[in-house]
Design a protein with these regions (language model features):
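C-terminal substrate-recognition "lid" of short-chain dehydrogenase/reductases
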Residues: 131, 226-255, 260-261
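Short C-terminal tail/terminal secondary-structure segment
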Residues: 2-13, 238, 249-297
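Catalytic loop of short-chain dehydrogenase/reductase
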Residues: 150-172, 177-186
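Alpha-helical segment proximal to the catalytic Tyr-Lys
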Residues: 139, 182-186, 246
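Conserved glycine-rich cofactor-binding loop
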Residues: 27-29
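Substrate-binding pocket helix/loop in short-chain dehydrogenase/reductase
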Residues: 110-111, 118-123, 218
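Short, small/polar-rich loop/turn modules that mediate ligand/substrate recognition or access, typified
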Residues: 100, 185, 190, 248-250
Length: 297
């Protein structure tokens, strides 16, 4: 039964009808929001992650809203598990039209105090795992049918103090994106990336309470004077999966309010609240099930 979903997407209804799109890390944060928008546009969303409870909850939300979603528990750092998971998805659905490589994670640690184990864990999750999922989606489906891959990276331009492990992994994923776009173009596969800046997402809840004041102050380093929303990030992802981006490949779409362009000595003031409400920059939040991070509550 098809019902009208309450997600307020800016894209045309039915845009992705009939497509199977995999979203890793789809049980929370940006992945959860993106899964909802994709489903609202007609896609069958395949949620992938390590937490069955979160995946089940998101799949149930999508179903209640009239969409279609299934889920697979998988540790994307384990090569054999990824191969088996993708094979199962292809067997169930015939092909994979799109992949949102969203799974990731990091923790606050200066380089001098980062252990080799901690460094490797972040690299495995944010770089190696994404590579494995993309490779298997290509080898087992997209190589034969074409497709679109969107890798989620981060605002690591210039540096990423306190999270050097994540910055290195994300920079590696940008290079992977560019190389895969070249190597896989002959098979009709597009590969792009989205780099979220400071987004008010549930991912912020993973940081310790003492980081709260610092997180809240980060808005003052963004020229637009605010945090982005999950829905603003999701919209960028959907665009890159859509036919409108058919000639876009090998690029990184930043969703960051121009934060990397801030320069010492150049008018460090940010947009005031009244300016933030102007049509071209006012916050967009089409996600009807968005959850405010605890640090902002």
């Amino acid at each position: 039964m098809t019902t009208t979903t309450p997600y307020r997407s800016v894209f045309a209804p039915g845009l992705l009808r009939g497509q199977v799109i995999m979203v890793t890390g789809g049980g929370s944060g940006i992945g959860r929001c993106t899964a909802h928008e994709l489903a609202s546009l007609g896609a069958h969303v395949v949620l992938v992650g390590r937490n069955p409870d979160k995946l089940t909850a998101t799949a149930q939300e999508i179903t209640v809203d009239g969409g279609q979603a299934t889920w697979h528990s998988c540790d994307i750092r384990r090569e054999d598990d990824v191969k088996a998971m993708v094979a199962q998805v292809v067997q169930q659905h015939g092909r994979i039209h799109g992949l949102v490589n969203n799974a990731g994670g990091q923790y606050i640690s200066p380089l001098a105090k980062t252990s080799a184990k901690g460094w490797q864990a972040v690299i495995d999750t944010n770089l190696t795992g994404g590579f494995l999922v993309a490779r298997e989606c290509f080898n087992q489906s997209m190589q034969q049918h074409g497709g679109a891959v969107v890798n989620i990276v981060a605002d690591m331009w210039g540096s990423m103090p306190g999270m050097g492990h994540s910055g290195a992994a994300r920079a590696g994923m940008v290079s992977f994106t560019e190389t895969a776009a070249l190597e896989w173009a002959t098979q009709g596969v597009r590969v792009n990336a989205v780099a979220p800046g400071y987004i008010a997402s549930s991912g912020m809840d993973h940081y310790p309470p003492e980081a709260g004041p610092m997180l809240r102050e980060m808005r003052n380093t963004v020229p637009q004077g605010r945090f982005g929303t999950e829905a603003e990030t999701s919209a960028a992802i959907v665009f890159l999966l859509s036919p409108a981006a058919s000639f876009v490949s090998g690029t990184v779409l930043r969703v960051d309010g121009a934060r990397p362009q801030m320069r010492m000595g150049w008018q460090q003031a940010v947009a005031t609240p009244d300016v933030q409400e102007r049509d071209a920059v006012k916050p967009f939040d089409g996600f009807h099930r968005a959850v405010t991070p605890k640090v902002f509550q």
